[in-house]
């Protein structure tokens, strides 16, 4: 008698488990929109009595929508903070049957905005060897962002990946940069964009050391009679 009761219980539990299949979690709307709409789908055995099902949603193993009859989960204007691993759970009314979907990885990274490039230098007239700083900044875009600097299409130095939304490059001026276009590029795993090109200032002839040199001409004392100053060029 006890054996029959065990067998009947096993059969009953097996049939209960087959009332509905393992759920599948999917994203309904396009990844190009800012809204997030998820649907938890399961198939109920048509030969079994109708069962009242409840849907729960989880993000990174934390519940975000507890048992309800709604198989949909919606976030309006979702942002990067809503990225994560999502999962749904379907269970029967009495809670005896519970099935989980596989994880769905939602990545809500945003594209970089067009970077703004500025040139900073102390010298009034740039000469070869003077130090200048290129500063590339973006207002929007998921981190990390990779920055690259260009002079007439040729990369300057190595690409930079700082922790923030700006990168700077300190570099010595070259004579051939005179009047050429310079720009910077910002790139993350979603998109890339390039700043508006700008003209590099004219580079004066000579080097930075020559530009700052004072030339002193020594004349005989007899030539300086009546001259209260020393000639400098």
Swiss-Prot record:
Domain Ig-like per the UniProt entry, residue ranges: 23-98, 115-195
Chief subcellular location: membrane
Name assigned to this protein: Cell surface glycoprotein gp42
Subcellular location: Cell membrane
S-S pairs: 40-88, 136-184
Highest taxon, organism lineage: Eukaryota
Expression tissues: NK cells.
Membrane-topology annotation of the record: Lipid-anchor; GPI-anchor
GO cellular component entries: external side of plasma membrane; plasma membrane
UniProt keyword terms in alphabetical order: Cell membrane, Disulfide bond, Glycoprotein, GPI-anchor, Immunoglobulin domain, Lipoprotein, Membrane, Repeat, Signal
Removed propeptide positions: 207-233
Glycosylation sites: 29, 66, 181
Keyword DNA damage: no
Residues linked to a lipid group, GPI-anchor amidated glycine type: 206
Signal peptide extent: 1-16
